[in-house]
Amino acid sequence: MNRCNIRLRLAGMTTWVASIALLAAALSGCGAGQISQTANQKPAVNGNRLTINNVLLRDIRIQAVQTSDFIQPGKAVDLVLVAVNQSPDVSDRLVGITSDIGSVTVAGDARLPASGMLFVGTPDGQIVAPGPLPSNQAAKATVNLTKPIANGLTYNFTFKFEKAGQGSVMVPISAGLATPHE
């Protein structure tokens, strides 16, 4: 082999290696700056969510069965949610809930311990409210409707806590339990 032939082979090899490196860099950089599909997933629950300072409200929903076009005024429906206190040392208390669709009555122990949870209402299909066995005391929130409501729509609710303050969120009607197919 002569020197010319060796130089051509080296040049061809260098070009080939450089093009492979460029291709690898281009392929690995294609996803740069993009948000992955799993980065912002929301929980698969019926209700909405709200954060008021250190208090997180999760799976907020109206629990009612709609048998006609609307759930009529005068009927009482339950409001179900889970409140989580992220403060490690400050307890809080649910002072009240207001809504445009009716008056909301909160009964039971509405205290929210530091780093603890408060269950409001009993979800469909459960006999007792979820929570630790020694202190299985959930509060109950009942909405006495003054306006008709319907599935598929959301309704404004304002939650007021003693220390965290207040916040508003649009709340849906729960889809409820599915009836078994026969």
Swiss-Prot record:
It is a lipid-anchor. A lipid is attached at residue 30 (S-diacylglycerol cysteine). A lipid is attached at residue 30 (N-palmitoyl cysteine). It comes from Mycobacterium tuberculosis (strain ATCC 25618 / H37Rv). This is Putative lipoprotein LpqE. Its main location: membrane. One of its GO terms (cellular component) is peptidoglycan-based cell wall. The gene is lpqE. Keywords: Cell membrane, Lipoprotein, Membrane, Palmitate, Signal. It is found in: Cell membrane. Residues 1-29 form the signal peptide.
